[in-house]
């Protein structure tokens, strides 16, 4: 079996052999390319057990404990990156089976060997890819649209989304030319032990923007699967921080003072002008929580001098 990136062989799974170093998943490049790191990386790509849409699709066709079978039969194709697996002697090409180019299995018909990208969606809420290329998220998501709009007003790169019946439809931030590498898949941080300083060191100003906007909206769950990089799918280059996405935990805090606020300001002081700018824009938000937390940030900045 081969790990591919589009039509380029990247890693020989059977023989644990690197075939293209530049296109290796970050975790394998940083921690050593072997079947232990390959398996660990694959686990980060799987859907969460709390995603009821993914769990339903998985159960009706594959059962609940059949990851190896799912990987083999769906070729582990995702709608977030261009990695997939195939047999060494299989002549099939990426364009013939990728959800970027071809219809995929969404549970509306019997599974017939297509890609099943919903089975590779992370996060806690119920989510599913639809044939229009958008990720549909269900549940109480009204605040998510407010967060997206606030990011736009602040000039921060962010996902685009439309309101739908019962949820939102999120436009894909990736393409056949740019793929997402979540921070937990990168090998550049410990997903269970990182802090604001780690984010600043990895992403600089863009990382500071994320920390401050999360402080404004009271997002207490920016875990390592909820941010990352965009990578060039031909060269493997890390192009930029990915647009911000997944605001499920906005309003975890509605207080005027907490560690989320004080730590964000503390670690983002190298970018204090940017912090002041974002907080100034957010202080005019219609959402009262966003407004009062932004005002707290402005006061904290002044007190730091």
Region locations from a protein language model:
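Phosphate/dinucleotide-binding and metal-coordinating scaffold of catalytic cores
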Residues: 1-219, 224, 228-305
């Amino acid at each position: 079996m081969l790990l591919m990136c589009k039509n380029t062989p990247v890693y020989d799974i059977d023989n644990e052999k690197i075939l293209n170093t530049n296109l290796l998943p970050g975790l394998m490049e940083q921690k050593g390319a072997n079947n232990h790191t390959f398996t660990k990386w694959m686990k980060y790509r799987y859907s969460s057990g709390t995603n009821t849409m993914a769990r339903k699709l998985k159960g009706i066709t594959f059962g609940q404990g059949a990851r190896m079978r799912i990987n083999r039969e769906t070729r582990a194709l995702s709608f977030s990156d261009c990695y997939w697996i195939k047999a060494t002697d299989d002549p099939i090409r990426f364009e013939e089976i990728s959800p970027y180019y071809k219809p995929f299995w969404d549970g509306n018909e019997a599974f017939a060997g297509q890609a099943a990208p919903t089975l590779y969606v992370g996060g806690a809420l119920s989510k599913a890819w639809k044939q229009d290329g958008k990720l549909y998220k269900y549940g109480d998501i009204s605040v998510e649209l407010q967060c997206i709009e606030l990011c736009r007003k602040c000039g921060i790169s962010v996902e685009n989304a439309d309101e739908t019946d019962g949820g939102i439809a999120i436009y894909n931030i990736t393409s056949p030319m740019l793929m997402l590498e979540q921070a937990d898949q990168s090998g550049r941080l410990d997903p269970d032990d990182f802090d604001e300083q780690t984010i600043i060191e990895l992403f600089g100003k863009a990382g500071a923007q994320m920390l401050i906007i999360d402080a404004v909206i009271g997002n207490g769950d920016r875990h390592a699967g909820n941010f990352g990089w965009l990578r060039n799918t031909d060269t493997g280059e890390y192009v930029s921080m990915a647009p911000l996405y997944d605001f499920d935990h906005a309003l975890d805090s509605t207080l005027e003072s907490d560690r989320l606020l004080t730590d964000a300001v503390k670690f983002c002081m190298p970018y204090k002008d940017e912090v002041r700018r974002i907080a100034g824009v957010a202080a005019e938000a219609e959402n009262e929580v966003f407004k009062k937390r932004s005002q707290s940030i402005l006061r904290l900045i002044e007190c730091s001098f």
